[in-house]
Amino acid sequence: ERTSVFFDEEIYEIEKKMVVNAQKSIKIATYTYSKSPLTDLLEKRKSEGINVKVAGGKNRDGHVPQFDMVVTTQKNGIYHPKFMVFDSKDVIISSSNISSERSASNSAVLFRDVPVAAAILESEIDAVFSNKFERRCETGCETETGTIIFNPGKGCVLIKNEFLKAEKSIKAGVYTVTSKNPVITGLKTAIKKGVDAKLIFDNWKGDDGKIVNKKAFNYLSSKGAGVKFDEPEQKNESLFHHKFAVIDGVTTVFGSMNWTSSGCYRNREIIVINKDPQIAQKFEKYFDSINQ
């Protein structure tokens, strides 16, 4: 298949397969990095002559890999995109980091033979290695994968616009949500006009011991959304780390961005707006399976 969607444990398996099969190059963006079986495999491929580059936002364990890696910092926000490019043509865009924590619940989309998208993503990695924080696709770049947006940019406004187009349903799974940003504004307006919105948030707690998403949970519930918290103890996972929304069973929004002000305005993020109903149906089927 040219396009495939993966969830949870499936993601590591496809990442491993793509790394093993790469012929020339592997370029990766991630927020957190730590030593893991996947990074061991990347080191092996580097020793075999494959060009391996990783741009990360945070090295969690201090491990220095035997491939090219840059840990980058920004004046505002964090470096948070999550994607892989293989041989300048195949792309995985994910909610998953390159870290030893594999038990988190995530989603990823593999696009094969997408050179336009691959070139855009590779230029992002190359810019980070050159210590250049370039504005890229801030209002959206049309590619074989759909519309790619890098924030800081217009990503949240574009998601809002997609929500405003909704006629029947919005189904979303998101790790972190705050109650004031364009995405939430669009969602609130869609609900007001009768769109059925079902949402699942992670129930992680901040340093104060309070559930971070509780305020957004209460706000959206009061507006008529069907909101629930994920229950990780039932699925042996550490956190619900998704960042996706399915609109009318046709349009899918996915990538690295949480629905927060930081995600909208400060962090480096990748967002994809895709109109392939087959992708939407796979995300929707997954959502329905966990929204019991």
Where are these regions (language model features)?
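Short, basic, glycine/proline-bearing loop/turn elements
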Residues: I26-I28, Q66, I170-A172
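N-terminal "mature head" segments of proteins
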Residues: R2-F6, A22-S25
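PLD/PLD-like phosphodiesterase catalytic module centered on the HKD motif
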Residues: E1-V5, I11-Y12, K35-G146, P152, ...
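N-terminal carbohydrate-binding/catalytic regions of secreted carbohydrate-active enzymes
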Residues: K24-S25, A29-L38
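Active-site beta-loop-alpha junctions enriched in small/polar residues
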Residues: Y31, Y175, D202-W204
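Secondary-structure "cap/kink" motif recognition
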Residues: I11, K16-S25, L158-S169
